[in-house]
Amino acid sequence: MVSYLGWHGRGNLGDDAIYDVVQTQLCGAVFVDIPHHPHEQLFASATGLDHWARGSSLVIGGGTLAGRRYFRRLLDRGIETIGDGDCFAVGIGVEDPVFQGFKSGSEDDELRRWRPLLSRFDTVSVRGPRSAELLADIGLEVEVSGDPALLLPQPEIESENGLIGVNLGFGDDLWGHDPERLVTEVGGAVRELVSRGHRIVGILMHEDDRDRTERALGGVAARIVQPEDAVSAVAELARCSAVVVSRLHAGILAALAETPVISLEYQPKCRDFARSVDDERSLIRTDSLTAGAVVERVSDALENADTIKRTVGAAVKMYRERLAADYAKVRSSIGLPII
């Protein structure tokens, strides 16, 4: 049995992508979610799930969980529930305290409170170099294995010349704390790109992305698609010649599809991933973003698409190998057969 800590099943395709990968890599295991809310905890106790989870293995599925107070409390409870079971964290992200959003939960030296918890783990690897640096600051040396979503199947889809994907959504907060300005500037960029002959498709990673995406794409002929799952999202991103994205996993799945990315860096985790695939040129921080800068980056990405695809593709290949090796170790540790 695997006790799983993540954020899947709540409408975010990025978190669902990670869960899909972990389930595939650990196929044969029975998964039980670590409860998030009081009513879920009561249900786990009343139905005996807590009892059955005793001695199970705990897996942090990925996402930017480490360094956040909310997830530390969930992890505390999960470790207490499993008792002597093994713990594994593959490709996790670490909240950078340099950014203080409305719900970050990383203030008051929160990350140091994670050291004794993560020290108990059999395996810890992280999404990107900044996550590794943050853990090194609290005395934990870890390897960068990449984001688990990079282990989804790679698509075999030809990109459509001139098709630009746009994803406009984010979690609790962003650099600059001004989402309306972001909508305005991206909208200006979209209109300019259309005037230059490009076609636009809006790609939703969460239903909450719809309102801002519709407003940014207002006034132009554009489709908006909401993929039903992560694999479908990869396919939509693969059809594009380039994508302008804010959601972290829109950028990660685009990298998997080898589609050039312009990443609207709304939080440090976007830079963490971009550094991991040697693609910092893709980043525009949301507190300094302008329509002109977006258009310029799109033009540059299209002009240098072959180089970008080779560079990012090589990094993705390396991380797919590292992630597969990490999960093979987890499978061996918990007694699952080789796949």
What residues fall within each predicted segment?
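Active-site anion-handling motifs in enzyme catalytic cores
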Residues: M1-I339
